[in-house]
């Protein structure tokens, strides 16, 4: 698949286009220009490294939303085996914005749950753009309770702009469904490992993000509202989204500094969308480490540690400036 470049990557896009042009010429010519191609590839790599070393929070949010970024189902095929998808909330419907089911992780049974966006227009509509309705969260809840019943770990993958705000979702109890998940996840008697793989938007993300370990991919985001939404509320203009992104502290690095995130999983140069396989390997290693650490805890220790973790949120110290 040809890489789609973001606005701030235009200089990289120009170089890559030139490289592709030279490759095409070399295929149809006896002239050896591999040295020139190699030089440009090296230059493109260095340029990408320089640009990504100083991304702004707004630019990071654009990378987190990249249409070619790997989604939950991509990681399921790259990291897990024997995946068996489970459908429906047993109350209303099967929400396609959330996928989940039983799988094996290095041979060990686990329950995997995650948001799922779409690639093309048809799939985006089918997945409701990754915005779950109440039945999606109730499906996730059903699977988590099933995991607890069988004593297997839960791994969740968060990637949503937020819970669906439609009237039908509100009528079916959107806020109750989210709140119920928070309540139950806080007391699940099995390890829960949460990974923010793209956008972590508001309560729609939080509803499957309460756990023992919270990790974020390097260029993912996690916030109470989108930068555009924040700008529209505070300044009545979505054009100030870059300023809102900076103010809210939505990046993995910022959230780790605040103690809200346990681990940042490095992405390949240029973002996860550049190399799905490499990203999956990095994430698999992070999941292995987290599961190994949690597997050594008794149920009582697991719950006590989780409670202490949740109660630490929101604590901070103020220091007077003389």
Curated annotation (Swiss-Prot):
Disulfide bonds: none annotated. GO terms for cellular component: acetyl-CoA carboxylase complex. It is found in: Cytoplasm. One of its GO terms (molecular function) is carboxyl- or carbamoyltransferase activity. It catalyses: N(6)-carboxybiotinyl-L-lysyl-[protein] + acetyl-CoA = N(6)-biotinyl-L-lysyl-[protein] + malonyl-CoA. Keywords: ATP-binding, Cytoplasm, Fatty acid biosynthesis, Fatty acid metabolism, Lipid biosynthesis, Lipid metabolism, Nucleotide-binding, Transferase. Pathway: Lipid metabolism; malonyl-CoA biosynthesis; malonyl-CoA from acetyl-CoA: step 1/1. The keyword ATP-binding applies. Its EC number is 2.1.3.15. It holds the Pfam family ACCA. PROSITE patterns: COA_CT_CTER. One of its GO terms (biological process) is fatty acid biosynthetic process. Its main location: cytoplasm. It comes from the Bacteria. Residues 39-293 form the CoA carboxyltransferase C-terminal domain. Component of the acetyl coenzyme A carboxylase (ACC) complex. First, biotin carboxylase catalyzes the carboxylation of biotin on its carrier protein (BCCP) and then the CO(2) group is transferred by the carboxyltransferase to acetyl-CoA to form malonyl-CoA. Belongs to the AccA family. Acetyl-CoA carboxylase is a heterohexamer composed of biotin carboxyl carrier protein (AccB), biotin carboxylase (AccC) and two subunits each of ACCase subunit alpha (AccA) and ACCase subunit beta (AccD). This is Acetyl-coenzyme A carboxylase carboxyl transferase subunit alpha. It comes from Dechloromonas aromatica (strain RCB). The lineage of its organism: Bacteria, Pseudomonadati, Pseudomonadota, Betaproteobacteria, Rhodocyclales.
